[in-house]
Each structure stands twice: as C-alpha cells, then as structure tokens.
Amino acid sequence: MKLLGLLLLVFTFMALAFADEKDCIARGQKCVGENKPCCKGTTCMYYANRCVGV
C-alpha cells in the first residue's frame, strides 16, 4: 500500500512539472505578441522580445 501511495505521489509531481512547461514560454524564446506568460523565474524583456531570467 505504501508503494502505491508513493507511486501516486511521484506521478502527481511529474504531471504538475510537465503541465507547467506547456502553459508558459521558455527562457530565450520570443514573448511579445504571444498569449502566454514567461515561465517561472523569467520575465519578458519587451525591447529584446525574449524571456530572460530574473
């Protein structure tokens, strides 16, 4: 039973990690005019049109 709980926990964290990637723009990608925010830990530099680390 402990193994099942552990596997469920691992799969839940994996699903959350993969879902975050699809809903945001990765570092170094163009961000101006896109309908998505930059990923966590990055911000859109409008003059450079790129997501950069904070």
From Swiss-Prot:
Gene Ontology MF, one: calcium channel inhibitor activity
Superkingdom, natural source: Eukaryota
Tissue expression profile of the protein: Expressed by the venom gland (posterior main gland) (at protein level).
Disulfide partners: 24-39, 31-44, 38-51
SUPFAM superfamilies: omega toxin-like (SSF57059)
Chief localisation class: secreted
One GO CC annotation: extracellular region
Signal peptide: 1-19
Keywords, sorted A to Z: Calcium channel impairing toxin, Disulfide bond, Ion channel impairing toxin, Knottin, Neurotoxin, Secreted, Signal, Toxin, Voltage-gated calcium channel impairing toxin
Location(s), subcellular: Secreted
Functional note: Binds reversibly and blocks P/Q-type voltage-gated calcium channels (Cav).
Domains as described in the record: The presence of a 'disulfide through disulfide knot' structurally defines this protein as a knottin.
Family label: Belongs to the venom Ptu1-like knottin family.
Name by which UniProt lists this protein: U-reduvitoxin-Pr1a
Species of the source: Platymeris rhadamanthus (Red spot assassin bug)
